[in-house]
A protein has these predicted regions:
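Non-catalytic signal-transmission and effector/linker regions of two-component phosphorelay proteins
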Residues: 1-5, 120-137
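Conserved acidic carboxylate
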Residues: 10
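Charged docking surfaces used in two-component/phosphorelay signaling
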Residues: 17-25
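Helix N-cap/capping motif at the beta->alpha junctions
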Residues: 32-41, 62
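Active-site beta3 strand of CheY-like receiver
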Residues: 46-52
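Active-site residues of response regulator receiver
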Residues: 54, 84
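Receiver (REC) domain active-site loop signature in two-component systems and cognate sites
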Residues: 57, 69
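Alpha4 helix (beta4-alpha4-beta5 surface) of REC/receiver domains from two-component response regulators
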Residues: 64, 87-114, 120, 124
Length: 137
């Protein structure tokens, strides 16, 4: 089986190291970016199988990168796991508000994980998304 490539976009160095280490020790090929601008560049270069994306980042934030991904036909089908300290209900509501007036509203991410992050939970989500399995609501 081909090793799956996962891009981690996270501004916090310690969290970036933690997530990439968890993924690599579980057999995934993980690369990391410190912000959305670098993340978009790596998506174009590496074509990852899945993206783990922090919502709150300075400069090119996670939501802005998410919007770029989901409105680009080349990348819109790459599964995205959003990470945030914000409750998922609050995030999904703000995503819906940002979509008002757009011809094609932004879809909800394939998964949303609240911080503090649990390695087991993240790996379970990654495994299911890469296998094309549905996630529990």
């Amino acid at each position: 089986m081909k090793e799956k490539n996962i891009l981690v976009v996270e501004d916090d160095l310690h969290m970036r190291i933690f997530i990439t280490t968890v993924l690599e020790t579980s057999g995934y090929n993980a690369t990391a970016s410190k912000d959305g601008q670098e993340g978009i560049r790596k998506v174009k270069e590496d074509r990852p199988d899945l993206i783990i994306l922090d919502v709150m980042m300075p400069e090119e934030g996670g939501v802005s990168m998410y919007r770029q991904l989901k409105t680009d036909n080349q990348f819109k089908n790459i599964p995205v796991v959003m990470l945030s300290g914000v409750e998922s209900k609050t995030f999904l509501h703000s995503l819906k508000m940002m979509s008002i007036g757009l011809r094609n509203p932004l879809p909800a991410p394939e998964a949303y994980v609240e911080k503090p992050l649990k390695a087991e939970e993240l790996l379970n989500i990654v495994q299911k998304l890469l296998a094309g399995e549905p996630l529990p609501e």
